[in-house]
Regions:
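Short beta-strand->loop micro-motif that forms the acidic, two-metal-ion catalytic signature
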Residues: 241-248
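Short beta-strand
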Residues: 234-238
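Short helix-terminating capping/connector loops at secondary-structure junctions
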Residues: 230-232
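Right-hand nucleic-acid polymerase module
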Residues: 1-85, 91-205, 209-210, 214-228, ...
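Short acidic donor-binding/metal-coordinating loop in glycosyltransferase active sites
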Residues: 153, 240-241
Length: 377
């Protein structure tokens, strides 16, 4: 089967493959974050005007010629590695490519996005322009879901091998077409070798997130199809390795896990579920995921702990002004407060506005104006 994912300026309610073939102009590379994926045995007749196979192969040739000096048996010397502490405990290894390699990986990423029309399944939300955590959670809130299954994949980036990426790309247009061309096959495979470290995708590389979203298209498609066909008003999202499936009615989550495992097995996926992070609950409990809670009323909220922390920050900021109403906070601290307020307003606009209004009245001040003044310094 071949998977074709197209970005659209608009998505007709009943978009069919026949409509795509007859009206190829609806395939657009404009400013949009919605996509539609089709799974077909044959894609005869599908020839987007923006795609030119010879042009793409030549671009890969030029890329490989200019980066030949970085093709090494031991890629580790082109990376600096360090570890950061995870909130859940333990450490996450970060492999940061050197400037030349990072520049090369960004160039290859641009080739994939510009020439290959590389896209993501519409249920993916991480590392995608115009998509974010808030939109990911909003999809479930807008669905008025009551029951939620949360899980994630273990060692997601590190387990994705070079061989697995090639295998999955052979199912995805237009990579399948390039791989079917002898010259294109050699050039694409050579270029992709610059993206791997110690047998997996390094966290810290600018191209790793895009590659994971790309190769997950067949899996995302199958999971979403299963969820939508088998549960009443259900919703599926994936944020990197974090999975959420929700519905207005309860469901047998073990059956869902079992079916998804079958999908992963059929695709030869080298990763699987993290049982310790698999939870099934309704929204009467602490329904937190990705730092955002969906409460019993179906509304998104930052939760009382973060509200308490915000109030502490606001109080500290107000008290930091001297007699001349000048803020003595460091610039970076003011920027942090401004960013926190902006982010929280995306999640819970009215609730955050109420907190700020409360403190403005309580301390006879204008917090937003004070922040703007502090940032001018």
């Amino acid at each position: 089967m071949i998977y074709v994912t197209i970005p659209l300026k608009y998505i007709p309610r009943q978009l069919t493959w026949e409509m795509v073939i007859k009206n190829i102009e609806i395939v657009d590379k404009g400013n949009t974050y919605d996509t539609r994926t089709f799974c077909r045995e044959s894609i005869t007749g599908f020839k987007p005007a923006a795609y030119n196979e010879i042009f793409v192969i030549n671009a890969l040739k030029r890329f490989n010629e200019s980066t030949a000096f970085m093709q090494k048996d031991d890629m580790q010397e082109l990376y600096s590695s360090y570890s950061i502490r995870k909130k859940s405990g333990g450490y996450r290894r970060i492999d940061n490519p050197c400037s030349d390699l990072k520049q090369a990986q960004n160039r290859l990423k641009d080739i994939f996005e510009d020439f290959f029309l590389a896209r993501y399944h519409t249920c993916a939300y991480a590392y995608i322009p115009k998509r974010n955590i808030v939109m990911c959670r909003q999809k479930h809130a807008a669905n008025h879901s009551k029951w939620f299954l949360y899980t994630d994949f273990s060692n997601f980036f590190g387990s994705i091998t070079y061989e697995y990426v090639i295998k999955m790309l052979s199912q995805i247009f237009p990579f399948n077409s390039i791989l079917a061309n002898p010259t294109g096959n050699a050039e694409l495979k050579k270029a992709l070798k610059l993206c791997f470290l110690n047998g997996g995708l390094p966290q810290g590389s600018p191209i790793s997130p895009m590659l994971t979203n790309l190769i997950m298209i067949p899996i995302d498609y199958q999971i979403n199809k299963y969820v939508c066909q088998n549960f009443k008003r259900a919703s599926y999202t994936r944020y990197a390795d974090d999975i959420c499936i929700s519905s207005i009615d309860g469901f047998d989550y073990k059956e869902v896990i079992s079916h998804i495992n079958e999908i992963l097995k059929s695709e030869g996926a080298p990763f699987g579920f993290n049982d310790k992070k698999t939870h099934y609950m309704n929204n009467n409990w602490k329904n937190f995921n990705l730092g955002i809670m969906i409460n019993k009323d179906g509304n998104m909220t930052i939760g009382w702990r973060k509200k308490k922390e915000l109030k502490t920050l606001l109080h500290s900021f107000i008290m930091s002004h001297d007699d001349s109403n000048k803020c003595i906070w460091e610039l970076r601290d003011v920027q942090y407060l401004q960013g926190i307020i902006a982010y929280y307003k995306q999640i819970e606009p009215q609730g955050i506005a109420n907190i700020i209004d409360l403190y403005n009245k309580k301390f006879h001040c204008n917090i937003q104006w004070q922040i703007k003044q502090a940032l001018k310094i």
